[in-house]
């Protein structure tokens, strides 16, 4: 198994903010949040506050191409999963691990239908 050096997270709700500070502390600029539109603007302007600490994570948009992430964490609500699957396209390479932290196993099936298992 290859070392995980670059991580992309999509979804900064309850699950996402649990992982984000911890991973960011370890990886710095190699950890980034995938967001666009108003959400991206808000995160760049205000950051995200977790337990009274404000964090400013690097933000990338879905259209950014380049080196794929070693790990993509999907932490969106179930109703946003289809869009998230499309949005992570440029972050996924042949060796990328995709981790879904949504409840249930249906999300894994939907992701595998697009990216393989």
Language-model region placement:
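NAD(P)+-binding Rossmann beta1-loop-alpha1 motif at the extreme N-terminus of oxidoreductases
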Residues: 1-56
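Rossmann-like NAD(P)(H) cofactor-binding subdomain of soluble oxidoreductases
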Residues: 53-55, 60-117
């Amino acid at each position: 198994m290859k070392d995980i050096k670059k991580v992309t997270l999509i979804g900064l709700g309850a699950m996402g903010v649990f992982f984000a500070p911890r991973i960011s502390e370890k990886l710095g600029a190699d950890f980034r949040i995938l967001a666009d539109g108003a959400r991206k603007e808000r995160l760049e302007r205000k950051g995200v506050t977790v337990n009274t600490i404000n964090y400013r994570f690097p933000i990338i948009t879905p259209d950014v191409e380049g080196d794929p992430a070693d790990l993509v964490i999907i932490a969106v609500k179930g109703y946003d999963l289809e869009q998230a699957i499309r949005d992570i396209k440029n972050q996924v390479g042949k060796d990328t691990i995709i981790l879904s932290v949504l409840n249930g196993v249906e999300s894994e099936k939907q992701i595998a239908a697009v990216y393989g298992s």
